[in-house]
Amino acid sequence: MMRIGLFLLTNLAVLVVFSIVFGILSSVFGLGSVHGAGGLNIASLAVMCAVYGMIGSMISLFLSKWMAKRSTGTVVIEQPRNASEQWLVETVAKQAKAVNIDMPEVGIFDNAQPNAFATGWNKNKALVAVSSGLLHTMTPDEVEAVLAHEIGHVANGDMVTLALIQGVVNAFVMFFARIVGSFVDRVVFKNEDGPGIGYFVTSIVMDILLGFLASAIVMWFSRQREFRADAMGAKLAGRDKMISALNALRPAEARPDQMPENMQAFAISSGQTQGFSIANFFRSHPTLDDRIEALKKYTPGQS
């Protein structure tokens, strides 16, 4: 639950900061003429929200590989130092060739919890990394399946897709928050002289409330991408290997997630939530049981 709370607070903090900056630029400098004598200029507001909503997501996307390396301490394998590293590089190269993408960077990060992630702004400029814990606890067949899962994320363009979705929902949040803020300012506070305290306070409050809904939407898309990456893992490595790899993650799922907050949506697993919980709406990954059940229904050739 702490992981989910931190994730939501981070996203909401970003929205609030954008809200404050947006308010200063539009009211003090008149940027975009969002506020006019008759109230909000809806067209200008829509354009400005779209721009501001996408900026943060695009910056995060382009910095994703650099941030991932720093936050996880990933060491890229420039020249394999042992048979294990050589096998990792060769396996990723084989899988990348199978899905027709350029060879990603391959790295290892020091973490006792078995995990892995893929990131990068472009499918041909990606990074695939595995934890030391994964290499120590999984069999070669299971590691192969995990790598295939991550290559699936890269080949499917999941990093770009989630960044675009986050940008779109951020834009909608900012847009509707300001619509409500303007309504409250004019109708409740009877302010006809431009944006007042009612507008700014209401906009920030609505940013927070709508931000929760936006996070749930983004996480729903994230869960769907996990199913697709699992299917790619089954296609490249074999269904039995993929199921075995997911089963091998069960002990780790019972422990708190050790991945940095900004990387949890791109890892192969996240903390487990038993039974129904509101927290399930904010999970970046489906439960292992759901993922394994989907794989059992998978047939070769299925996308």
Curated annotation (Swiss-Prot):
GO terms for biological process: proteolysis. This is Protease HtpX. Pfam families: Peptidase_M48 (PF01435). The chain crosses the membrane at residues 4-24, 42-62, 157-177, 200-220. Zn(2+) binds at H149, H153, E226. The active site is at E150. It comes from Psychrobacter sp. (strain PRwf-1). CDD domains: M48B_HtpX_like (cd07335). Its main location: membrane. The keyword Membrane applies. Its EC number is 3.4.24.-. It is a multi-pass membrane protein. Belongs to the peptidase M48B family. GO terms for cellular component: plasma membrane. One of its GO terms (molecular function) is zinc ion binding.
